[in-house]
C-alpha cells in the first residue's frame, strides 16, 4: 500500500466534527510523514476554498454595502485581494479544469459540460502530491460527466481524501457523501412549493445541514488531523451560491429585498447584442430557466437577496475554517485562497445564471490570497489576472518546478508587492460549453484596461465595449464607426492571445 492509500484509510478515523464547532479529534496517522521541506525551505500548507458561481462584487468592503461578509472582510485585511481576476470559461467544468491545471480550457480538452478531462492532464494537486503533500477534497470536483447518477470518473488527481458531493439533488444516491450524511442524520432536504421553483426561497432547515457547512466540517476535521504533520492541501468546494437561489431561512431573513438595488439592465439594450442573450432574457439556460421577462422587479431583488444570503453562509463557514487553522497552530504556514469558479449574471443585462456571454458578472470572480510573512497583507490590486495563474503560483510557493505544460504566469511578484502589473489583457473562451443554443456558440473574449471585445464565430459578429466610458457594458459598439479603429486593434490583440494559448507540449526534442 502506498502513502496515499494509507493516508486515505487512516486520516478520517476520528469521529465527525460536532456541528457548529471547529473542534475535531486528530486522526491517527500510521505512515511516517515526509519532512515539511523541499531544498531546505519549509513547504506551506494550502487551504483552497472555492465557492460556486460567486461573482466579483459580492464581498463586504468591495463596493457592496448590502451584503454581510465580515469574515471575508477580515481575511482581506490580512491578504492580497486581486479585484480583477477572470476565469477562462464562464461554465463550471471547463473553468475548473483550467485553474486546476494552469492551462486553457481548449488545451485541457475539457471545453464543455459533459466532457471528460484527458487522463494525461496533470492537476496541480497531483504535482503537489508527488512532492509529498497530503491532498484532501470536500465537495465538488466536476472534471468529468456526472449526469444520470454516476460518480464522475477520476484521473490521477492526487487526492487521498475524497469526500465528494455535487449539488442539492439526490441523483447520486450512493455517491453524494453529503446526502448520505443527511440520511444518517435522519434529515430530509425539503422541496420548495411549486410556485417558488425558479425563484428565491428560504429553506426551512438548520444551516448546519447544508452542503456548505458539511464541506466546512470536513475541512476542519482534515485541518486538525494534520496539525502535527505536513505539508497538506485541502480543497473545499462549496456549492453555494450556485442556483437555485435557496438559502436557509435563517440567512434569507437577514435581507430585505426592497433595500437591494435592481439588476443593471437598460430596456432595449439587447437589440444589437448576440441572439443568445435575447434567448436567455426570455429564459436562462437556452430558454429553459429563470425568465427575466416573466418575473417582476420584486422577484429580481428577492433573488439577489437570496444569493447574498447564501454568500453570507459561505462567509460564516470561511470564518470557522480560519478559526480551525488558528486553533491548530497552522495559520502562519498556510496559504489560504478564497475564490470562485465563475460568476452569475444575477439579472444584469436582463439575464440570470450563466451562458455564452462575457460580462464582468459572468467571468470576473473574487480572489483573496493570504500567506503570513510572505504575501503583502492588506494589498488590494486591480492588475489583470487569469485563473490559470494560480497553479504555477502555488508550485512556486512550494518550491516545486513549474512544468512545461502550464500556461499561467506565477502571481508571486504581484502578491509580494514587487510589481503592480501582471498582464496586458485577459483571455476567456466559450466553445458550446452548455449545448443549449442554436447555432452552437463558439466565442472568444479578450479585455484589457480599457476595452472588451467578444467574437462569435458562427454569427460572424460580436460585442465591443469601452469600459472607461461604459463600465456597465450597456452599449455594444461593434458596428459603431467611431469605435472601428479601436475594435480592429483589439481584434489583433485577440488573435495574438489565441496564438499564445497553443499547447506548449509535447516538448520538441530535436530539429526533426
What residue spans do the PLM features occupy?
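Formylglycine-dependent sulfatase
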Residues: 2-456, 461-462, 471-492, 496-499, ...
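A short, polar/proline- and glycine-enriched secondary-structure boundary/capping micro-motif
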Residues: 464-466
